[in-house]
From Swiss-Prot:
ATP binds at K19, T178, D179. HAMAP family: ProB. Pathway: Amino-acid biosynthesis; L-proline biosynthesis; L-glutamate 5-semialdehyde from L-glutamate: step 1/2. This is Glutamate 5-kinase. The lineage of its organism: Bacteria, Pseudomonadati, Pseudomonadota, Betaproteobacteria, Burkholderiales. Residues 285-363 form the PUA domain. It is an enzyme of class 2 (transferase).
Length: 378
């Protein structure tokens, strides 16, 4: 029997991304499994009522579309896959909406592509929307927008999308529910000596050799995609669990600390990982100058930069670009992701958030740079 207090990683996780595979959602392609989806939704509701925030990344649109269209074999033509995704997405989202509503929880459909997360402005827009939904106690149900993006159907997988969403919202953990118990040292269907891996470091090169290429004929991803997804999620400090989706009360038991499935532990803390990524990969586009009070709040207080504390804007930058924050002497004190373009920043400089709608024509974030997107300069 597992020690229920033996795994603090999931027990302490407050923001969780759950990814469930198509073979589970559609009962191996035989149509949406209403009982299983209902059980997951019941668990999601319990987690939210426990004060956690949860995002569901669900495969199954293409598989459900195939069932509705009477196709037994997954087609190879892109336009047929897109058609199946369009047909299946209707039923998939309706099922989640119904089952979550039965448990008193609201839901929202969010369709993303990798391109949405590669563009800085769209990245921030998606992040803001998802964080707002979480604050409202709503479960975002996310899928790839297979209907319009060719190479996502051809090359993408929802394991990767789950990891990207974990990066996007700075999740504490990614739970990948699959039709396998977890990771073994070899394929247990071929090697009777294969040993189960209870815990390992995310990104360990040896894991990829263990994973092999086994996967479902209904979905796109095998165990190797899950290992790579865990590595990607660890880049923003999120640990990953790969577990059997039919395990009774799996989500509840995991968040109570029970050791179910394979735990792949991130080696970097969430905040450190995100800020290191910003420092390494994003180019400086401009700067803002701030008054002594704002400088102190950013440097000493660890607070967000508010427009009312800005005294000047330099350069030409867009929302999502990296800008420098300079004190009254022109010395850089921090860098961060701008919530407003340089043109907008000039309009709201020295203004309070209640004035933004009149000045900009809309109400956006109250911060010029949120504290989670700020890196103090040395």
């Amino acid at each position: 029997m597992h020690d229920p207090l033996g795994n603090p990683v999931l027990r302490n996780a407050r923001r969780i991304v759950v990814k469930v595979g198509s073979s589970l959602v559609t009962n191996e392609g035989r149509g949406l499994d209403a009982i299983a989806i209902g059980q997951w939704c019941e668990q999601l509701a319990a987690l939210i009522k426990d004060g956690r925030e949860v995002i569901m990344v669900s495969s199954g649109a293409i598989a459900e579309g195939m069932k509705r269209l009477g196709w037994s074999l997954r087609p190879k033509a892109i336009h047929e896959l897109q058609a199946a995704a369009a047909v299946g997405q209707m039923g998939l989202v309706q099922m989640y909406e119904t089952k979550l509503r039965e448990n008193g929880i609201g839901s929202a459909q969010v369709l993303l592509t990798h391109a949405d997360l590669a563009d800085r402005e769209r990245y921030l827009n998606a992040r803001s929307t998802l964080l707002t939904l979480l604050q409202l106690g709503v479960v975002p149900v996310i899928n790839e927008n297979d209907t319009v993006v060719n190479d996502e159907i051809k090359f993408g997988d929802n394991d990767t999308l789950g990891a990207l969403v974990a990066n996007l919202v700075e999740a504490d953990a990614l739970i990948i529910l699959t039709d396998q118990k977890g990771l073994y040292t070899a394929d247990p269907r071929k090697d009777p000596a294969a040993q189960f891996v209870h815990e390992a470091k995310a990104g360990d090169a040896a894991l990829e050799a263990m994973a092999g290429g086994a996967g479902s004929s209904i979905g796109r991803g095998g165990m190797i995609t899950k290992i790579l997804a865990a590595k990607r999620a660890a880049g923003s400090g999120a640990s990953t669990v790969i577990a059997w989706g039919r395990e009774p009360e799996a989500l509840i038991r995991l968040t109570q600390g029970e050791a179910i499935g394979t735990l792949l532990v991130a080696q970097t803390q969430k905040t450190q990982a995100r800020k290191q990524w910003m420092a390494d990969h994003l180019q400086l586009r401009g700067s803002v100058t701030v008054d002594p009070g704002a400088a102190s709040m950013v440097q000493v207080g660890g607070k967000s930069l508010l427009p009312i504390g800005m005294t000047g804007v330099q350069g030409d930058f867009s929302r999502g670009d990296v800008i420098a924050v300079k004190d009254a002497d022109g010395v850089e004190i921090a860098r961060g992701l701008a919530n407003y373009s340089s043109a907008e920043a000039r309009l709201i400089c020295r203004k309070v958030s209640s004035e933004f709608e009149k000045l900009l024509g809309y109400t956006g974030e109250s911060e010029m740079v949120h504290r989670t997107n700020l890196i103090l300069s040395r």
